[in-house]
């Protein structure tokens, strides 16, 4: 397994270089001259030239690319154009609030979806199964903005069960006070598509020969579903969970914006509004690297869950 991990990490290098080159091209050739963006409409040529020198964009492209690569390797992306704050510090300080929301959400979403998927698979084709799928379809058709507005107005404003907005320096207060309503909203939004997907995974396994063999041997339906079917359905479930994990690192854009949560999602929106390229580039590289690492972790988890999986 160690040899496989080393080989995969080595293979990530050219992929990451391709991502870095693509980001560099997009922001330097397609994104326009940052000096004009920072200087504004009332600038003169001398101001534009001074800004170019400060940013280093007056140098040849290969020099700029090398500077960008060094920034990635040292995790030092310079300062934000809009606030002057260190970009690395922005990422580190905004990551905590996003993870406070999204780690509990991922755990709850996965566990609840698996339980309900097994339950509806046990009564597949019944009225209950059709009703659950219909509710999932309705839930998926409603915009997250509707959920945010309704839940915020009814549960926070009218009933005062949750704070409307806010965030503090206390992790406990954030988790058990300010995060509850945002997590509830995101759970309601995400549970419908996840449940439908996991149900399809379970039903694919229910139709396999080993299930019919287990039934013929007199194994109970609940044991077949909870042990045999779940074990084999866990591979695509792990794939789904791992593919969604990079989203943990960019936060929930709308939720963080509406609830005033200082996470990475809200920071991305602010950076885009202000054309803060250093912040956007850093987060883009950061997500690309995280995606490749999570894919590697998923492959290793496959081996742990099912020893029959061969890592090649």
Segments the model singles out, each with a brief description of its role:
Residues 2-4, 91-128, 144, 171-312:
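Alpha-helical transmembrane segments of integral membrane proteins
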Residues 6-16:
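N-terminal signal-anchor/signal peptide hydrophobic helix marking the start
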Residues 17-22, 61, 103-107, 150-151, ...:
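Hydrophobic alpha-helical transmembrane segments of multi-pass integral membrane proteins
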Residues 26-30, 38, 42, 72-73, ...:
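Hydrophobic aliphatic residues
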């Amino acid at each position: 397994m160690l040899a496989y991990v080393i080989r995969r990490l080595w293979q990530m290098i050219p992929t990451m270089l391709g991502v870095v080159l693509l980001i560099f091209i997009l922001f330097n050739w397609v994104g326009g001259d940052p000096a004009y963006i920072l200087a504004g409409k009332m600038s003169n040529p001398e101001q534009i030239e001074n800004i170019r020198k400060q940013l280093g964009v007056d140098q040849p492209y290969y020099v700029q690319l090398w500077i960008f690569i060094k920034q990635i390797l040292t995790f030092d992306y310079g300062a934000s154009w809009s606030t002057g704050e260190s970009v690395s510090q922005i990422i580190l300080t905004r990551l905590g609030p996003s993870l406070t929301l999204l780690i509990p959400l991922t755990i709850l979403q996965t566990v609840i979806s698996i339980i309900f998927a097994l339950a509806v698979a046990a009564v597949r084709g019944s009225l209950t199964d059709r009703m659950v799928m219909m509710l999932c379809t309705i839930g998926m058709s409603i915009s997250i903005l509707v959920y945010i507005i309704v839940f915020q107005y009814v549960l926070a404003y009218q009933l005062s069960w949750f704070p409307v907005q806010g965030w503090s320096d206390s992790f406990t207060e954030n988790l058990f006070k300010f995060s509850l309503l945002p997590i509830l909203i995101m759970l309601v939004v995400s549970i419908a598509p996840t449940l439908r997907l996991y149900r399809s995974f379970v039903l694919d396994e229910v139709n396999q020969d080993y299930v019919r063999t287990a039934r013929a041997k007199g194994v109970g339906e609940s044991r077949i579903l909870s042990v045999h079917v779940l074990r084999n359905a866990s591979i695509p479930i792990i794939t789904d969970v791992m593919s969604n994990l990079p989203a943990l690192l960019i936060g929930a854009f709308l939720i963080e914006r509406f609830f005033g949560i200082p996470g990475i999602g809200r920071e991305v929106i602010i950076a885009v509004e202000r054309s803060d390229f250093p912040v956007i580039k850093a987060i883009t590289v950061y997500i690309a690297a995280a995606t490749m690492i999570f894919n590697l972790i998923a492959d290793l988890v496959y081996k742990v869950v099912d020893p029959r999986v061969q890592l090649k």
